[in-house]
Amino acid sequence: MKRTLAILATNPLSLLGALLVALVVGGAVFADLIAPFPEHRGAVVDFVNFNKPPDGTYLMGTDLVGRDLFSRILYAYRISLMLGVVVLAIAVPIGVTVGLMAGYLGKWWDYGLMRLTDVFLSIPPLVLAMSIMGLVEPTLVNGMLAVTAMWWPWYARLVYAITRGEREEGYVLAAEVLGASRAHVMFREILPNAVPAILTKMT
């Protein structure tokens, strides 16, 4: 923590980035308190105040139907952050598990899981997400699941490559000789070495 703060203190760009992230997260979390027109996040129509330029009442102006753009942006932050957090919370564990199993267990696990991953990777991500949404009801939850289907293969491929490179290392062989289970080797020995790459991919 101290090292991170020291880096931020000596690097203006890092500090600026951290402040921008803090502003976005703060705006999303406290949107109900900050937004001057919280009711404008929904299907509100106000043709008296449509297309207004920024002023003291409407900080960023209004849209075509009179809704305050600043309020809507704050609530959009909330939806975007929630989407990102939920998608990562589902996609990363799936992708990591698939990659570890295929890379470490090998044989038909490798062939079956990686061919499944290749099928998903062969489809353009946005096309895949839109195709899924075309088959189900267009809700936020279904949207999250569609994006999850788009993202997990990338983590699977990343962890698979790392696992293939690590499984013959001395520390892995030592754990196997000592009688460690496959799950222990995968999640306690190999996975920690993949965490930096996973975190980089997540951000």
Map each language-model feature to its residues.
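Membrane-helix interface/capping residues of multi-pass secondary transporters
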Residues: 13, 107-108, 140, 180-182
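Transmembrane alpha-helices
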Residues: 78-94, 183-203
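Low-polarity contexts
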Residues: 19-22, 175, 182
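Conserved RecA-like P-loop NTPase ATPase core
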Residues: 8, 175, 194
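Gly/Trp-centered helix-boundary motif
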Residues: 1-96, 100-101, 107-111, 122, ...
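Generic hydrophobic transmembrane alpha-helix motif, especially the helices
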Residues: 59, 63, 69, 90-94, ...
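Helix-loop-helix units of permease transmembrane domains in multi-pass membrane transporters
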Residues: 72, 171-178, 186
